[in-house]
């Protein structure tokens, strides 16, 4: 994965070599946590594959092991993270791959293994951990977000939620957690007791944040 990252030296770079990566899908749209993309982590790091489609999880299940053929695709940089997709046709660094074309690049290897997350403290999270699948333990919601829900309600449409940043701390440092307004638990109350959060280190709105993956793995401690 590090070699692939090194190729993304420009805003968008065409991959001309035969490069394959094998890893686990550690984030997708199963719970609405990441739309129109999947994150593949090979144990050394991750990359976000942009996809044009809905219900991606039905084709590429969360935590499945996959092989991605990178030749012919483009790498791009979105802040501190590396993304991959089709050659860009507009202002984006890469375009999304159509669902109909996805399996020309992506092969399912195994659907029966769950990847191990890397256990980190908040202080260990930086750009070098971008798109890694991680677990952070003994986290506490900040005082001024107690009794809130994971996402704020959209004032223009009270039936929908907005993508929201929440904050957790470990007594020493504070972690930003980005929660997609489309996630299945957007309207649920935030945990009031210490907990563990599992997810990917992501880049959101110009900063590093944790994006929860597979919400049912949040553990009260």
Task: Give short role names for the model-derived ranges.
Residues 1-35, 39-65, 69-221:
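OB-fold nucleic-acid-binding modules
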């Amino acid at each position: 994965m590090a070699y692939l990252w090194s190729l993304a030296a420009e805003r968008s770079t065409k991959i001309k070599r035969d490069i394959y990566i094998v890893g686990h899908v550690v984030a997708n749209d199963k719970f609405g946590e990441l739309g129109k993309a999947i994150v593949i982590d090979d144990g050394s790091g991750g990359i976000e594959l942009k996809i044009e489609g809905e219900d991606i999880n039905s084709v590429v299940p969360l935590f499945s092991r996959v092989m991605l053929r990178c030749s012919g695709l483009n790498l791009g940089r979105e802040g501190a993270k590396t993304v991959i997709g089709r050659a860009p046709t507009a202002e984006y660094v890469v375009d999304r791959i159509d669902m109909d074309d996805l399996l020309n690049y992506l092969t399912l290897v195994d659907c029966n293994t769950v990847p191990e997350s890397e256990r980190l403290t908040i202080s260990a999270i930086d750009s070098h951990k971008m798109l890694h699948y991680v677990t952070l333990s003994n986290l506490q919601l900040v005082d001024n977000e107690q009794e809130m829900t994971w996402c704020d309600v959209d004032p223009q449409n009270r039936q929908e939620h907005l993508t929201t940043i929440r904050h957790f701390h470990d007594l020493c440092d504070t972690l930003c957690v980005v929660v997609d307004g489309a996630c299945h638990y957007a309207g649920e109350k935030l945990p009031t007791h210490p907990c563990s959060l599992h997810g990917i280190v992501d880049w959101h709105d110009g900063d590093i944040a944790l994006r929860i993956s597979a919400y049912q793995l949040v553990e009260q401690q």
